[in-house]
């Protein structure tokens, strides 16, 4: 009996070892699979490649690897087989190192560049008025088409249902433009000038969803609503000239909110009176009562909604914030920001800039 017990124990140990080896093997395979499927980098700069007639999957894999768009040629060829991609059309294609294998293969399946294709670049910090102008300039749509879609109740309900980050907050009647802040600024390609406003919006919302998915946990754990967070990100974007300042800018506004201070943001005053940032901001603009203005005699504690389209850096600064002791910042005429901890320090900094001829005056 004792012998049999020892044999059973030995067999059990062997089984455990085999199971452990199997699990390690599976984990290694999964890790390898995920690694080679993932993007090469976060670089969104597009690279154009031309696939010639008669190119094989091996030729395409070699070209993609050479341009730094995939991690491994053999894995790419294997993955293409798994996806059952048979024919790739000879054409010009656009890829970026930030695309994963699925996105690259989807692009190949779509058939590449066509001569009627249009490209529109929406820069970080652009507002809805700027987007409407660009859509008018580059497509068959008018600015009025854009504004009508922003008021289209049926479309807004559809968008709220489809995208987890859109809520009924965007339907507040005091908001100037319902999707302000939610259309991710980037370069987008469309088949031709007849693209609809809805198609443009959906593509931009799809990209915003990808960006915000990275911060879903932080958003869920925040004391602020997603609408408030996007609003803060838009203010951070509009206040900053240099992306390196975004983290400190966001921390200033978080610190002010914690202590009950007014946000006191000039960019909300501009937006509230529908002025561009290049316009002169008058005292009457600062004192104007509107649902966005956080300065003046009767400031709102929080703008009713976003004031621009925040990019990736501004979103990161707001959704993954740092802690500082800063409560103030001021810009010189060269767009350099100076951060300070107290009102006294802030006022001294302004005096210093004035004395040095660096103070920005209209």
Report each predicted region and the residues it spans:
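Signal peptide-directed extracytoplasmic domains
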Residues: 33, 37-208
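Short non-domain terminal segments
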Residues: 10, 93, 326-327
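A generic short-segment signal for beta-strand/edge and adjacent turn/coil regions
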Residues: 15-20, 61-62, 87-90, 152-158, ...
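N-terminal type II signal-anchor transmembrane helix
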Residues: 5-44
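Bacterial extracytoplasmic/cell-wall-associated proteins, especially those involved in peptidoglycan
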Residues: 133-144, 155-362
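N-terminal targeting leaders characterized by basic, low-complexity, disordered sequences
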Residues: 1-3
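Short N-terminal secondary-structure initiator segments
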Residues: 22-28, 44-58, 123-128, 264-280
């Amino acid at each position: 009996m004792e012998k049999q017990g020892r044999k059973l124990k030995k067999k059990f140990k062997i089984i455990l070892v085999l199971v452990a080896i199997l699990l390690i093997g599976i984990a290694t395979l999964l890790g390898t699979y995920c690694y080679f499927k993932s993007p090469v980098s976060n670089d969104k700069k597009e690279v154009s490649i031309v696939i010639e007639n008669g190119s094989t999957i091996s030729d395409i894999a070699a070209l993609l690897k050479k341009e730094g768009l995939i991690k491994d040629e053999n894995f790419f060829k294997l993955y293409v087989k798994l996806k059952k991609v048979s024919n790739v059309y000879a054409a010009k294609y656009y890829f970026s190192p930030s695309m994963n294998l699925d996105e690259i293969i989807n692009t190949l399946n779509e058939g590449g560049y066509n001569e009627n294709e249009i490209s529109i670049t929406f820069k970080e910090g652009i507002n809805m008025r700027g987007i409407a102008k660009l859509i008018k300039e580059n497509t068959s749509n008018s600015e009025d088409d854009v504004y009508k879609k922003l008021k289209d109740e049926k479309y807004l309900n559809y968008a709220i249902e489809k995208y987890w980050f859109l809520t009924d907050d965007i339907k507040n009647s005091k908001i100037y433009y319902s999707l302000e802040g939610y259309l991710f600024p980037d370069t987008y390609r469309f088949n031709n000038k007849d693209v609809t406003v809805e198609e443009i919006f959906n593509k931009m919302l799809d990209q915003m969803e990808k960006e915000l998915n990275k911060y879903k946990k932080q958003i869920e754990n925040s004391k602020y609503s997603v609408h408030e967070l996007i609003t803060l990100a838009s203010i951070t974007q509009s206040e900053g000239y240099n992306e390196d300042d975004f983290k400190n800018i966001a921390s200033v506004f978080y610190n002010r909110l914690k202590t009950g201070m007014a946000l006191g943001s000039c960019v909300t005053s501009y937006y509230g009176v529908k002025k561009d940032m290049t316009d002169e901001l008058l005292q009457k603009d600062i004192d104007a009562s509107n649902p966005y203005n956080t300065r003046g005699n009767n400031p709102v504690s929080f703008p009713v909604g976003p004031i621009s389209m925040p990019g990736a850096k501004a979103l990161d600064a707001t959704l993954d914030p740092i802690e500082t002791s800063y409560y103030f910042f001021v810009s010189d005429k060269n767009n350099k920001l100076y951060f300070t901890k107290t009102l006294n320090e802030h006022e001294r900094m302004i005096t210093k800039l004035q004395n040095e001829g660096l103070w920005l005056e209209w």
